[in-house]
Amino acid sequence: MTPEFDEEVVFENSPLYQYLQDLGHTDFEICSSLSPKTETCLTTEEPQTPPTRVLQKQGILLKLTETIKSWTLSSQYSKKDDLLHKLDTGFRLDALDAILQQEVLLQEDVELIELLDPSILSAGHPQQENGHLPTLCSLATPNIWDVSMLFAFISLLIMLPTWWIVSSWLVWGIILFLYLIIRVLKFWRTAKLQMTLKKYRVRLEDMAANSRAFTNLVRKSLRLIQETEVISRGFTLLLDRVSAACSFNKAAQHPSQHLIGLRKAVYRTVRANFQAARLATLYMLKNYPLNSESDNVTNYICVVPFKELGLGLSEDQISEEEARNLTDGFSLPALKVLFQLWVAQSSEFFRRLALLLSTANSPSGPLLTAALLPHRILSDVTQGLPHAHTACLDELKRSYEFFRYFETQHQSVPQRLPKTQPKWRELNNVHTAVRSLQLHLKALLNEVIILEDELEKLVCTKETQELLSEAYPVLEQRLKLIEPHVQASNSCWEEAISQVDRLLRRNTDQKGKPGVACENPHCTAAPLLRPTLHIEDRDPIPEEQELEAYVDGIDIESEFRKDSLYHVSQEDRERQKREQEESKRVLQELKSVLGFKASEAERQKWKQLLFSDHAVLKSLSPVEPVESVSNSETPMNSDTEQAHSEATEEETSKPCASDKEDTRTEYMCDGPPKGQSKDTSGDQGHLLQGAHQCESEAKPPQAAAAGATAPPTPRDSPRLSIKQRLARLQLSPEYTFTAGLAAEVAARSLSFTTMQEQTFGDEEDEDKEQLVEGGERELEEK
């Protein structure tokens, strides 16, 4: 047939030829199916065909030479190929077993592996005899070739006795030594390769274990963050975590601000591990491709662009502010999405690695070389992935342990709180416990309402016994749902009781000095006492100082804020307000009556009497102070004295606003400590802010002077005599009320260095004197 197609040419025995014959057309050119050149070649080659016997002889010789050649080659490379095959198969099976044992694959990835290569899932089956790397003993075992060579050498020595000549021993010894050296070098090379494969297998196990540990640690961190967010709203997830609830001064804090350091650590570590696993998977797909089913892009997350994933998962480094904006302030939903991406990407990497290390992809026969062993593939694929796993795991573990074992317990245990803790942390703890109790009771009430509705339906409707028997398990399940809330409510109640008891037993002295606790179960804990103020001797007016200390008391509503703890009714508030206003009005009237200015000469006398060391230490006769004070008194008319006496009677008859309580507390005055000198500076006094107002208002000057506690030590005998003399001054008719008040302040200022808290009730004066004497004996014993 010519290169140019001729439409008139029809091949013989072709379908077109048969069709034309059937139609009756015979006027066309017929061409044979073979070309003329082929026909001529066939005619010329037919007489040159050799006989069959010659062909048979040539085939036998070729087969014999190929057999000898293959036997010689197999004798040289059979052992090496067998060892490489054992090492390759053993490493692949051990690597697959490590991946499957660590459970780093998701269920969908396991199903996909079972669909693509079912032999991978049976890699760790105990029936696999070659599932482990060959040991060094198996590698050192001689094969048939070595044994045959040894027997051949011995047989030659026995058959040829002439070789037993001593001169020939050197030659045969050198040959045997060289053979042994070659065998030892081969064994050393094989053992080194076996140790390398074993090291990479351990590295793969560690990488899978670190990946699993990191996943579990991220899950624990997210759970801790979620629990902290829920606890910050006042609801406790665990019964033993009631005391670990945050104080309500953080209740207004945004949920994303809790454990912000742990949130940042979770984001950084998960992002770094996700990027490393993604790059390793892409590298496998590019440099070690498999079949189209295994490398289908629909089965891989790593081919999805970063822009579609979001959350700052780009290859470029981003700042902390950008990460905060992209994750909505490291919110819990964003961290959960990032965690799900990491779990899927990690499982995808190990799935692709398992397919790559499958025994089905192992090179067969002489194609297997030391350069193609799977440990080189593993080293090339992983590269920096194990280091990234280890670094991220260590960083997240440090952050998690800090926030779990240090910050949480640091906030939950009151003894570990620093000195700069919130002022009302005890009240915050009580509020948290009560808030938790309220939420648990609400949940309990909802469950009880649901249970009651179901019981009413069962009672009202006439059901058969079978339906009732089916409803019993439902009721049992409802009761089991109620039980945790009951236990949690009991725990919250016990926590609130313990916090209130701690408030009642709290030591008011921060320096560790024992204080007298209030025995009244209804009284609240008093605020901490302020340090004693030192008053300079610039213009000492005793009555004004006493009244100012009385008026400028602590504002209970602003300082203590007891309304946050006890809910007082509106009537009680109005009554307390009226009583406070009445007491202030009486005090202002009393101060306006008594607050006149004394003359300079009288002030000088008071200074000498109150603040002079000579006046304190000098022993005077009982008549001298009366004369000195009576001489210094200015003449006053009878109207003024009558006003003073009326004010005194009004003050003594005025009931205290807080006399409804059973007990009252008074700070008694003691002498200075032993380490303090007697001659205290005369230009300094002491003022206690926040003293109990009702005691000062209800006592007349005579009772106040009589109720002062005498110092117990014999060193204070001069001061005792001074107090007695000052008490005698009040009995003098020439000694006015103002002078008596000044004498009372003088008596108190001499022993105003230490304070003692003592409780009084409605006892008689004899009981009071017994208490004073008992306090003196206790101080003498101390």
UniProtKB/Swiss-Prot annotation:
Recorded GO MF terms: myosin binding
Comp. bias regions, Basic and acidic residues: 641-667, 769-782
Record has ATP-binding as a keyword: no
Annotated InterPro entries: Myosin-bd (IPR026859), Vezatin (IPR026858)
Localisation per UniProt entry: Cell membrane; Cell projection, Stereocilium membrane; Cell junction, Adherens junction; Nucleus
Membrane topology: Multi-pass membrane protein
Pfam families: Vezatin
Biased composition (Low complexity): 619-635, 699-710
Example GO BP: cell-cell adhesion
Entry's Gene Ontology cellular component terms: acrosomal vesicle; adherens junction; glutamatergic synapse; nucleus; plasma membrane; postsynapse; stereocilia ankle link complex; stereocilium membrane
Keywords: Cell junction, Cell membrane, Cell projection, Coiled coil, Cytoplasmic vesicle, Membrane, Nucleus, Transmembrane, Transmembrane helix
Membrane-spanning segments: 139-159, 162-182
Chain segments carrying region Disordered: 565-584, 618-720, 756-782
Coiled coil: 434-471
Major localization listed first in the record, in broad terms: membrane
Role, per record: Plays a pivotal role in the establishment of adherens junctions and their maintenance in adult life. Required for morphogenesis of the preimplantation embryo, and for the implantation process.
Subunit record text: Interacts with USH2A (via the cytoplasmic region); the interaction associates VEZT with the USH2 complex at the stereocilia base. Interacts with myosin MYO7A and the cadherin-catenins complex.
Entry's family note: Belongs to the vezatin family.
Protein name: Vezatin
Species annotation: Rattus norvegicus (Rat)
